[in-house]
Amino acid sequence: SFPAGQQVGVGSPAAGLTVAKLVEAKQLLDENNVDPTLPRYCAVAPEQLADLLNITTVTSSDYNTVKALVQGEIDTFLGFKFIVSNRLSSESGVNRRVIAWAEDGLLLSIGKDITAKIDERADKGYATQVYYSMSIGATRMEEEKVVEIKCRED
C-alpha cells in the first residue's frame, strides 16, 4: 500500500481519472523534488483512458496532439507518458488504482534470465512445442517518486 502522502484520493463526489487528479499527482512528484527532466509515466486501465478522451482539454489540439481524437490514443499529457494495462488492481472492484511514477522510482529485477526451448512432441503427431520462461519482479525503489491515483469505475 502507498503512504497517505503519495495518494490522490477518489474525490468527492467520486470520479474517474480527471485533469485535476493528474495535476495533483504531478504536484506530489514536484514537491518531492523529483527531477523534472526524468521521464514520467502513468499506468491506466482502458476506462481511465476513456475518461481522459472525454475531457476537451486533453483532446484539444491546443493542449495535445491531434492523435488523441483521430486515433483514440493519448500518448502524453502533463508530462506523463500513458501506458494502458488491464492488470491494475482495484479496491473492492470499484476504485481502480492508477500508478504514476518517475523513471527511476521503480526497479525491475531479473531473477532468472530467459530460458527458451523448441522441441517436437512425438505424442502429438510431432507438433512443435515452444517453451519460454523467465522470472522477473519490480518494486518501488523510492516511495516519493511513485504516486497512486484512485479512480472510480462505473
Question: How would you name each of these model-derived features?
Answer:
Residues 55-154:
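Sequence/fold signature of self-assembling virion shell proteins
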Residues 2-70:
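Extended, solvent-exposed, turn-rich assembly/linker loops in the middle of proteins
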Residues 1-3, 103-104:
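Short amphipathic alpha-helical segments, especially helix-boundary/capping motifs
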